[in-house]
Design a protein with these regions (language model features):
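Catalytic core of nucleotidyl cyclases, primarily class III adenylyl/guanylyl cyclases
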Residues: 20-21, 55-130, 140-196, 220-231, ...
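Conserved long alpha-helical elements within nucleotide-processing catalytic cores of c-di-GMP signaling
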Residues: 27-49, 60-61
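Regulatory cytosolic signal-relay segments
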Residues: 1-14, 50, 92-111, 122, ...
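Intrinsically disordered, glycine/charged-rich C-terminal tails and inter-domain linkers
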Residues: 93-108, 163, 168-169, 177-180, ...
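Catalytic-site or vestigial catalytic-site microsegments of nucleotide-handling domains
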Residues: 15-28, 74
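Nucleotide second-messenger and two-component phosphorelay signaling modules
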Residues: 7-13, 32-35, 50-57, 159-162, ...
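Generic non-transmembrane alpha-helical segments
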Residues: 40-55, 134-145
Length: 378
């Protein structure tokens, strides 16, 4: 007779910034590298873990080709006391894995969601900035690390030199609550986070492919950033996701990966003629506003974005959201043409995504249009 023993640890409701990132084309790489896939994954994991840790985050789970990342804001009770909302309220304990308790937890979550305004938490704006900066640093390192660049010439991945292979990842960021606790049995227990907000981070990562950008962040996350951080992000769309009727804005930090990035050990005289950006590399000890303004990596990633492009896209996006699709088309097509002038860019992914959506509807907003659309891919 087999006796089923499950973990009876309780979970605690907490708030955090949740990140999810994924290695693109992993199945194909796995098949071609065979036993060397472990070295490939661990080389990338070292980059992800290093920059997430440096920029005040934690790597919670390694899922083969994907990573769940957490920038912890605080448990519910601590935040309620900090913000003076309910100083006498006990921390909510949720017994696992009882279905009735799960339903109760969901009801409590919905009721309490409006009680904690994360924007009021001291230091949360800098923490949000650091989560985005960590992602940008990872993207740069994937295109700077000699160990990772070596895969570009690996004959197993390039069809014996027929083309160049590039390591690419997708990244999602979202903020909200989760139940923090142990999941498993006496044989295997994992510390993890369970919540629709964790799922949303994964959904954003997956959708980054649809928009042709490496990074997608939600309105929930965007609202936590400093004004400087917000000014560096581009709003792409307003969407709803499966299981929710609440519209949410999505944003990106424009990142041009196909370029040469200096390292901290670069010789200034050799690089100055080909790269006008001063080699200033700032750490997490620096003010995040200064990092956005002066850090070499952050500036290099978005140096291809021009005021003319931003004006064309933003105008087109606003017209699209207002339902004037015929006029929006011209502005978004112009934005796409401007981005296509950038070396190694085949136009602007977000512009192309919106244009395809409007084209599928005959360039006429449906009569039921309310300024948002369902996200069709998970």
């Amino acid at each position: 007779m087999i006796v089923l023993m499950f973990c009876r640890h309780v979970g605690v409701r907490m708030y955090a910034i949740f990140g999810f990132c994924d290695i693109h084309h992993f199945e194909d790489v796995n098949e071609k590298l065979g036993k060397d896939i472990m070295t490939f994954v661990n080389t990338i994991a070292a980059v992800v873990h290093n920059y997430v840790h440096e920029w005040k985050g934690q790597s919670n789970k390694n899922l083969g080709q994907a990573f769940l990342l957490v920038w912890r804001i605080g448990d519910e009770q601590t935040l309620l006391e900090l913000l003076g909302s309910r100083k006498d309220a006990p921390a909510q304990q949720i017994q696992q894995p009882n279905a009735a308790n799960a339903a109760k937890a969901a009801a409590i979550a919905k009721k309490k969601a409006a009680q904690i305004d994360l924007r009021r938490v001291p230091g949360v704006d800098a923490l949000a900035d650091m989560a985005l900066i960590a992602y940008c640093k990872i993207i740069v390192e994937l295109n700077r690390s000699k160990d990772i660049l070596a895969y570009r010439k690996d004959p197993r991945l390039t069809m014996n030199g027929a083309h160049e292979f590039k390591v690419r990842m997708g990244f999602g960021l979202h903020a909200g609550w989760a139940i923090e606790g142990a999941v498993g049995s006496l044989q295997k227990v994992d510390a993890t986070y369970l919540s629709p907000h964790v799922n949303m981070a994964a959904r954003l990562e997956s959708s980054s492919k649809q928009y042709g950008v490496p990074i997608l962040v939600s309105q929930n996350f965007f609202d936590l950033m400093t004004e400087e951080g917000k000014s560096r992000c581009r709003r792409l769309d307003v969407i709803t996701v499966k299981g929710s009727e609440v519209p949410i804005g999505i944003y990106t930090y424009d990142a041009l990966q196909d370029r040469r990035f200096k390292s901290k050990r670069s010789k200034k005289k050799e690089d100055r003629s080909v790269d006008p950006i001063p080699p200033v590399f700032l750490s997490s000890d620096s003010d995040t506003i200064e990092v956005f303004e002066n850090d070499y990596d952050m500036r290099s990633l978005c140096m291809h974005v021009t005021p003319a492009f931003l004006e064309a896209f933003q105008t087109g996006l606003e017209l699209y959201l207002q339902g004037d699709w015929a006029t929006a088309r011209g502005h978004l097509e112009r934005a796409d043409r401007l981005m296509a002038q950038v070396p190694h860019k085949d136009g602007d992914g977000p512009s192309q995504t919106l244009l395809r959506y409007m084209d599928a509807h005959g360039w006429q907003a449906p009569s039921s249009w309310k300024g948002f659309r369902p996200l069709t891919s998970k």
